[in-house]
């Protein structure tokens, strides 16, 4: 198990909390909570050691397209593919943007 942390610039705080996915399914879960301070912090707990560069590249692509909300994101990963990671992350961001 490896724990990775990342930080990106962000805009206004996320509107609410969100949960996407289920780590028990052999996939991953994304937990998102609003945060103050114009920063998006991400903590990844993964079963795949040495995967830091892959996560960094994936997050850089996702957050280059649009300004992320200020939030604290925790990801519990059990070897999900980059496509599934992006899907779950986008689901959590969308859910957190709703009232």
Curated annotation (Swiss-Prot):
UniProt KW Amino-acid biosynthesis keyword: no
Keywords assigned? Cytoplasm, Phosphoprotein
Q: Tell me any Pfam family this protein matches.
A: ACP
Please tell me where this protein is predominantly located.
cytoplasm
List where in the cell it is found. Answer: Cytoplasm
Residues that the record marks as modified (O-(phosphoribosyl dephospho-coenzyme A)serine) are 25
Q: How is it modified after translation?
A: Covalently binds the prosthetic group of malonate decarboxylase.
Q: List the GO molecular function terms.
A: acyl carrier activity
Sorted alphabetically, the Gene Ontology cellular component annotations on this record are: cytoplasm
The family assignment reads:
Belongs to the MdcC family.
This chain's function reads: Subunit of malonate decarboxylase, it is an acyl carrier protein to which acetyl and malonyl thioester residues are bound via a 2'-(5''-phosphoribosyl)-3'-dephospho-CoA prosthetic group and turn over during the catalytic mechanism.
State what protein this is by name: Malonate decarboxylase acyl carrier protein
**What organism does the UniProt record list as the source?**
Pseudomonas paraeruginosa (strain DSM 24068 / PA7) (Pseudomonas aeruginosa (strain PA7))
